[in-house]
Amino acid sequence: MNRINMSQEIQQLRRLIFDELSKIVDPEIGVSIVELELIDKVDIKDGNVDIDLHLTSPFCPAIFGFKIAQDVRDNVYKIHGLDKVKIKVSNHFMADAITKQVNESKLPEK
């Protein structure tokens, strides 16, 4: 596949990813995590996606942080053409634990 087609494919995947992310609503605030600008980075390479995100507050309830991170991973994983989705949570007192638990949890059916 040539460089232009790869770039177009990545841009299409990026749009699909952000479409899925925009469906995820912060349970405390009731606003999309995309609108809240909680997504810090989306890297796509060889069917793998790394997503870095932060939460609205360093001390928001950990269950909400886990729910958001889990929804991010599960929603994005279902996109055709992606093999692996890795999440990294920051700016939260339990960021490392949430990141570890989400990345080690069972993946949804495709």
Name each model feature, range by range.
Residues M1-K110:
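Domain-level signature for proteins that mediate thiol-based redox and metal-cofactor handling
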